[in-house]
Regions:
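Residues forming the flavin
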Residues: 1-33, 73, 94-230
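Gly-rich Lys/Arg/Thr-decorated short loops/hinges at beta-loop-alpha junctions or inter-strand turns
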Residues: 15-17, 42, 81-89, 157-161
Length: 230
């Protein structure tokens, strides 16, 4: 596993609000409609169905791995609500859910003898022959270059928020993987769709903006422009 910075400097660590799950069989249609409506009905329906249907298994797996979600007084999982959801479906850990999930999983990955985490290592190209990917070219912090050969390559490079002056993303999340994929004619889709988190703490200081959770809007907060208009 290669990461451009420290393994804990990923946008997943910054997620605050929580993670959604299906609340029961009778919740499926509402959950599906909420998701489609939030995506202006341009969503891939198969992907939406898979996300909803697999959510309970994923949560059970996270609980098995000791992710600590908040519980109600009766000991059952507690739920909050986020924007576009018609009912509370969000499991959370204080306001640092992303850190709780990702750090728990990362700690377990570090115990695996068959997984090596290479921090401060940047992928600069794909090793390709006859249109077949055979690994990557990586560069460390001292500009040393290493060919890393592999039968399988997964590009999990996040978004492009680091390209913007104002962003809740880390600055190194800059779309490198997309650029390299384009160079090698890897099929990409919907690059014109950029998700911008709408609420941050205003500051004149340069750098990453402090994220204000979606849960704030889900619990009833409203967004207004500088003229007081919604």
């Amino acid at each position: 596993m290669l990461t451009k910075q420290g393994a804990d400097l990923s946008d997943s660590f910054l997620a605050q609000g929580g993670i959604c799950m299906l609340r029961g069989v009778d919740d499926y249609e509402d959950y599906f409609e909420d998701t489609m409506r939030a995506g202006h009905y341009e969503n891939n329906k198969r992907a939406v169905n898979l996300m909803i249907r697999s959510s309970n298994d994923i949560i059970r797996d996270l609980l098995w791995r000791n992710v600590d979600f908040v519980r109600a007084e009766d000991g059952e999982l507690a739920f909050t609500r986020e924007g576009a959801h018609s009912r509370p479906r969000i499991l959370f850990h204080e306001d640092i859910t992303g850190k709780e999930i990702t750090q728990t999983l990362l700690d377990q990955v570090k115990t695996k003898e068959n997984i090596e985490i290479c921090e401060y290592m940047t992928m600069v190209d794909i090793i390709s022959k006859d249109n077949i990917c055979g690994g990557v070219i990586a560069m460390d912090a001292k500009n040393n270059v290493y060919p890393i050969r592999s039968q399988f390559v997964v590009l999990a490079c996040g978004g492009i928020g680091g390209l913007f002056q104002n962003s809740t993303n880390y600055p190194h999340i800059a779309g490198d993987g997309l650029g390299i994929a384009m160079k090698h004619q890897v099929k990409l889709e919907h690059l014109d769709y950029i998700q911008i988190h709408p609420t941050t703490l205003f500051s004149h200081k340069p750098g990453r903006r402090f994220l204000i959770s979606e849960s704030v809007r889900g619990e009833g907060a409203l967004l207004y422009d500088k003229n007081g208009q919604r």
